[in-house]
């Protein structure tokens, strides 16, 4: 389904309809109009009606959640658009911010803070001026069209989010095919790291998806670190997983084949590429 226009409500703007519009814009580079919909708009399959209209009918391009009963699972307009695009489950798995956003939009800050186990004030301490400015500017316009700065930024956001969700699934499958779990011996019984061999062509971020893959793996509690190709050289990067303090890469900082070790010990870069040498460095870094 393609749309000739995206329509959302006027007045104050919230993250859910803003991001929902961004996603729709990524696949439908059309004008965004902010006004109340008419019955004709709701019936027109060429118009995406977002977060307004009291109707969830994806077959007609209508994505509102306000008509759902109060005990409905937290579901916002962003949830509905992600479902329409067929990527909701992956987005819930890969975007840690999505479920809190659903809660905040449908339950408000008090219930969301309680669900997260934090004080209400903590939520607002995490607010970003980027969010505030984009939402405030979006709330001020009646129509956005191609070429306008905010329209272009919204399309970028939508494209990046779509690309992240779609390519991460492919990346995780690839890691599962070629990655290896290494068991590194130590006096106290040893530890496990995830190793990614060098690939050609090398990914833009060779460590992308590694932590997410580990966290979805049954052995995640045993994995202390990651080894992955270094884009800046022929060697490898070594890093902690979940900031495991027992890997301290300052312990290998003086090794001839280690050209960088962060002062806080959580990451290092080495020119070594032989698996046995990499294992030696990891064992030496273990506290």
Give the positions of each predicted feature.
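Hydrophobic, aromatic-enriched interface-forming segments
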Residues: 106-201
